[in-house]
Amino acid sequence: VGSEMCIRDRYEALYLDRLLITQAPAIALGNAKKELVHLASYAIQSLEASYAFFAKGDEKYYDKVEKYETAVNSIDEELTTYLIDISNESLSVSENEVLASVLDSVRDLERIGDLAVASANLSQHIHNKGIEFSDTAKAELADVYNRTHRIALDSIRVVVDDDKVLAGQVILRHEELKKLEKQLRKTHTKRLNNGECTAQAGINYVDYLSHYTRIADHAINLVEKVTEGVI
């Protein structure tokens, strides 16, 4: 997850065998969970490319974000349809719980992809307008990104391995990130008041903070499904 993948012109699901829906819905549900991880790999790569575009300003990273977003949307649509079709079959109570959780998780991953795109669009605006961040602001955003990225990667590991120990660690790191965000908003307001950064850069800084922390929030939703034993 999260490593550079070959970007094809056409994106499609890998694990959604439609014959299994009626013949073996429980196995189809297991395949849907595998597809969820495939979807996650594109959402996280979109996040990585989005940050690279912010940090380096090279348009090739913006193009990657757009391609990964195409993949996320395509797989999201296919996987959602697959899950809805499975829900029409006879499933046990626990299988129905898992199905609902996978469906929720698809939405969370789709939102992570959307927020990565929003960050890339923000970066494009900043590069086009020549808006500059201070070195301190850049270092703070790099820290928030790295924490968010690690939470996102580990959230998928938690799902794949059903790792409740790692889940607990990730939840603690998410709490730390929320505290850091509050602290950064305060120190940033002081910078603005002291005239150390422009109002426009100030607004954009807060937007980045918001995008990254919301991505972490969506990743944590997946982790909590594991701690609740419903995925």
Regions inferred by a protein language model and the residue ranges of each:
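Cytosolic, long alpha-helical scaffolding segments
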Residues: 1-3, 8-231
